[in-house]
Amino acid sequence: MAPELETAAGRTTKEGVLYIGMDLGCYKTSVAATNGTREVVYSIVGWPKDPISRKMLGKDIVFGNEAFQHRLALDTIRPFEKGALKYADNSEAGVPPERLAKYKEAAKELVKYVVSLCRPPKGTLVYGVIGSPARASILNKQALMDACKGTFEAVMIVSEPFAVAYGTNTLEDALIVDIGAGTTDLCRMHGAIPTEEDQVTSGKAGDFIDNLAFELIKKAHPEAQFTINMVREAKERGSFVNDVNDKALVTWPNKDGRPTQFDITKELKEACRAIVPDIVAGLRKLVSSYDAEFQKRMLQNVVLAGGGSQLRGLDRLIEDDLQQYGGGKVTKVHEPVFAGANGALKLAADMPEDYWKEVK
């Protein structure tokens, strides 16, 4: 996917430039800037439900970690959940048409809030690179552009796995697997900007694991009281796909409200493993359609990124499946939370000044 740029009109000041790299995640958004700022926040926007919640919060709109903490007092929106605005059609993402405008408003407000965390000095030009899912449509990319209008002077949209590859300098003969909350994106790197044929996107990612685990646990432990967020927290504490001796034990209220310990090891493991077949199928597709001379070299350089890359044993499980291709080597990025934002920032900073001027 070739980079696309757009300029927000109306600002002509030339008092310096702040470059920003942003990974607008379905669950969390990370941002890095040339002034040293590095932040990660929940990708959630909330509006007070009534005058009481408005008085308690003292504001008309709440973002990120604060919105997540007070979500019961708010009408909340995760503007990029299930790939909405970024990848899937709004009907695919389960967004009612009458709510789509609210999702777009939330996306715009979230981008503005995240940029404000970078504290750009007054009069500074803000240039940004933002990651989108590998197979995002032109319509989805336009929705991201619209969310950035008025906040950035110029914006470049690149695929999330490409941003990871650029940041880790993994630009040739490599396969990047970026496992987020809403999508899992695979990208084949061959020393140039990847085309659509070099990329695969799957809707089975972190949210899919959470929802499947929720249903499996509900079936296995009908006496337990829990929410999807409690399942997500349990997954993040002890998620694994391979056979280990560790147990995933949680203390949740039972039907009577008494704290009770439940063993959800089997259910969590089954849910976490459920994303693996699509990842392996995507890798097979990208490898089998690559130049035969370089297939083996590419299989020796599979890189896992994104929050889902922290699933214990995922790298070994994929390596086992790659044995039918003669084997492969799977590694994980060192900073899964910031790998996309760091790469986007590096790309923004490396672009020649003339390149940004051309799109202003």
Please identify what each model-predicted range represents:
Residues T29, V45, V111, C148, ...:
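Residue-level signature of catalytic and energy-coupling elements of molecular machines
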Residues T7-Y42, T168-E196, A213, N242-D246:
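Gly/Thr-rich phosphate-binding beta-strand-loop-beta motif of the actin/hexokinase/Hsp70
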Residues W47-F63, H190-V276, N301:
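Phosphate-binding glycine-rich/basic clefts of nucleotide- and phosphate-handling proteins
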Residues L24-V129, I279:
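Conserved phosphate-binding loops in N-terminal lobes of ATP-dependent enzymes
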